[in-house]
């Protein structure tokens, strides 16, 4: 089984930057994307955009050469989650995610659903603790562990299920790299270049701090999408990380 995305249209990037596209207007989203270079970043499509515009928005981005992280955080019974992950793979996305709190059987089913895709399978990662959550939020859910402790427990479960990595805060990255190994990928939202507004993220870091902490892929949204010159902003971020992207 192979994905529908054409590998010939994809442009390989060495950048760890994933730009979060949070648009409710398709034309505005594509107008922004046409300002940037797929050598400088990958793109993340979340629930709002995918619900509004459907799979075609992913194809539109792929046709422009971009790898796409489909950030839908699947969390359902194992069979349903497995079919959803397989559908994402069939769409040709570069990365897809599930909620680790869905449990071991769900995550294992999701991983097994990607076996038929072979080398074309997307990276499969799990969400541990949302970066907007604090200890008081977890306590409301009956979780007495700190966000860091709960995230590490879920990350270990994710690795035991054979997934490729986790979404975690940058503050957890150093410990996770040490505990879970270099090959276990860490994807981190809440990344803000120096001087950017924190927005609704509670646990944030600069790109340079995130790279030093062991983050493999850093999700950056408004500091790029709301920049007066997003292409220049991306070049500057990549340069600060020692990445020459073209």
Curated annotation (Swiss-Prot):
UniProt-annotated catalytic positions: 73 (proton donor)
Q: Which reaction does it catalyse?
A: orotidine 5'-phosphate + H(+) = UMP + CO2
Q: Tell me the enzyme class.
A: lyase
Write out the residues that bind substrate. 22, 44, 71-80, 131, 192, 201, 221-222
Biological process terms from the Gene Ontology for this record are: 'de novo' pyrimidine nucleobase biosynthetic process; 'de novo' UMP biosynthetic process
Report the GO terms under cellular component.
Answer: cytosol
Q: Name one Pfam family in it.
A: OMPdecase
Pathways per UniProt:
Pyrimidine metabolism; UMP biosynthesis via de novo pathway; UMP from orotate: step 2/2
Q: Which domain of life is it from?
A: Bacteria
Q: Which UniProt keywords apply?
A: Decarboxylase, Lyase, Pyrimidine biosynthesis
Under the heading CDD domains, the entry gives:
OMP_decarboxylase_like
What Enzyme Commission number(s) does the record list for this chain? 4.1.1.23
Q: Name one GO molecular function term.
A: orotidine-5'-phosphate decarboxylase activity
Q: Which PROSITE patterns match?
A: OMPDECASE
Q: Which NCBIfam families match?
A: PRK00230.1, pyrF
Looking up HAMAP family in the UniProt record yields:
OMPdecase_type1_B
Q: Briefly state the protein's biological role.
A: Catalyzes the decarboxylation of orotidine 5'-monophosphate (OMP) to uridine 5'-monophosphate (UMP).
The entry sums up its family as follows: Belongs to the OMP decarboxylase family. Type 1 subfamily.
Describe, as the record does, how this protein assembles with itself and its partners.
Homodimer.
Q: What is this protein called?
A: Orotidine 5'-phosphate decarboxylase
Q: From which source organism is this entry?
A: Enterobacter sp. (strain 638)
Question: What does the record give as the organism's lineage?
Answer: Bacteria, Pseudomonadati, Pseudomonadota, Gammaproteobacteria, Enterobacterales
State which gene encodes it: pyrF
């Amino acid at each position: 089984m192979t994905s529908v995305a054409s590998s010939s249209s994809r442009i390989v990037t060495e950048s760890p930057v994933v730009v979060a596209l949070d648009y409710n207007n398709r034309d505005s989203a594509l107008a922004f994307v046409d300002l940037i270079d797929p050598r400088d970043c990958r793109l993340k499509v979340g629930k709002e955009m995918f619900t509004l515009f459907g799979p075609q928005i992913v194809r539109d981005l792929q046709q422009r050469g971009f790898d796409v992280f489909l950030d839908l955080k699947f969390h359902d019974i194992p069979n349903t989650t497995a079919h959803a992950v397989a559908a994402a793979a069939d769409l040709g996305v570069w990365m897809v995610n599930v909620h680790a709190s869905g449990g071991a059987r769900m995550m294992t089913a999701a991983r097994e659903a990607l076996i038929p895709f072979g080398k074309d399978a997307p990276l499969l990662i799990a969400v541990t603790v949302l970066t907007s959550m604090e200890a008081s939020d977890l306590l409301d859910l009956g979780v007495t562990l700190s966000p860091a402790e709960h995230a590490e427990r879920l990350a270990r479960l994710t690795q035991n299920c054979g997934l490729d990595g986790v979404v975690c805060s940058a503050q957890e990255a150093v410990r996770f790299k040490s505990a879970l190994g270099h090959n276990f990928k860490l994807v981190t939202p809440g990344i803000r270049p120096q001087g950017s507004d924190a927005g609704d993220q509670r646990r944030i870091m600069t790109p340079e701090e995130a790279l030093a902490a062991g983050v493999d892929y850093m999700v950056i949204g408004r500091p790029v999408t709301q920049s007066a010159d997003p292409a220049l902003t991306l070049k500057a971020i990549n340069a600060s990380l020692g990445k020459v992207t073209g």
